[in-house]
């Protein structure tokens, strides 16, 4: 069965997009048919896979099309599904137009379910669909959580790591109650970890204490190759497969696969 993982944290700068791109690339490297959907109007995930220009058909067009469920067939949306440098990885890009979608959806019928309609079609083709959610708790994020089977939460190893998590978990509970009863927590992922810093170790312990079993064993280190890769339009695994960042995301992908067995 297809898995739709929303990478979500309304707090910026926690490694959300880095995680979405590199987890998707890792699944693809493991020969899983994978799709990355960029739902962030900033379009950084698209850029991280080499798509710097706005595309003729992107996620904004697809969500508009999904106003009428009958429009959503694979043939109608395949133009938006683009190739990447990895055979098993495709992407649906985003751009600034997506920010307008928030206003367009306000008075729309079933406004939280647009992406879910699209997902019902895409799940028939892909084993893993990774969604890079917007860095805010808005209607676009509600669409993401309604369409997802699980949520992965990146948590930066810094002093205010758990700040804002209460709000995110409250939103997830509301979605579970009203829109998507099957939504699960895939796990919390510690990012930007530096074993030389006692603060990082302290925060990692605190996060594990607070979130216990939901925290992944894999931790993403602070790594220069992870920072450089997007400017080359590549995931870390293609930029430097031996880097600690690329290896950490591969471990994360394997952990998720093993958990599902």
What are these model-derived regions, one by one?
Residues 1-261:
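P-loop NTP-binding core
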């Amino acid at each position: 069965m297809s898995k739709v993982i929303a990478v979500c944290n309304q707090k910026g700068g926690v490694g959300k997009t880095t995680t979405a791109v590199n987890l998707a690339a890792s699944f693809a490297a493991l020969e899983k048919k994978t799709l990355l959907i960029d739902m962030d109007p900033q379009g950084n995930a698209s850029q991280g896979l080499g798509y710097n220009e706005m595309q003729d058909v992107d996620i904004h067009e697809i969500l508009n099309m999904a106003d009428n469920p009958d429009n959503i067939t694979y043939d109608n949306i395949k133009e938006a599904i683009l190739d990447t440098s990895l055979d098993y990885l495709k992407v649906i890009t985003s751009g600034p137009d997506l920010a307008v979608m928030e206003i367009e959806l306000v008075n729309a019928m079933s406004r939280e379910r647009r992406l879910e309609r699209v997902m019902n079609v895409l799940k028939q083709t892909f084993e893993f669909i990774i969604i890079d959610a917007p860095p805010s708790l808005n209607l676009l994020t509600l669409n993401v959580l309604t369409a997802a089977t699980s949520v992965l939460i990146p948590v930066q190893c810094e002093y205010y790591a758990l700040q804002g998590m209460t709000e995110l978990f409250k939103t997830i509970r509301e979605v579970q109650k009203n829109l998507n009863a099957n939504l699960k927590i895939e796990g919390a992922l510690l990012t930007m970890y530096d074993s030389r810093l006692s603060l990082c170790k302290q925060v990692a312990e605190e996060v594990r204490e607070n979130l216990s079993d939901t925290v992944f064993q894999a931790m993403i280190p602070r790594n220069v190759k992870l920072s450089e890769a997007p400017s080359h339009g590549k995931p870390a695994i293609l930029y430097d497969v031996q880097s600690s960042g690329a290896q950490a995301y591969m471990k994360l992908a394997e952990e998720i696969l093993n958990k599902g067995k």
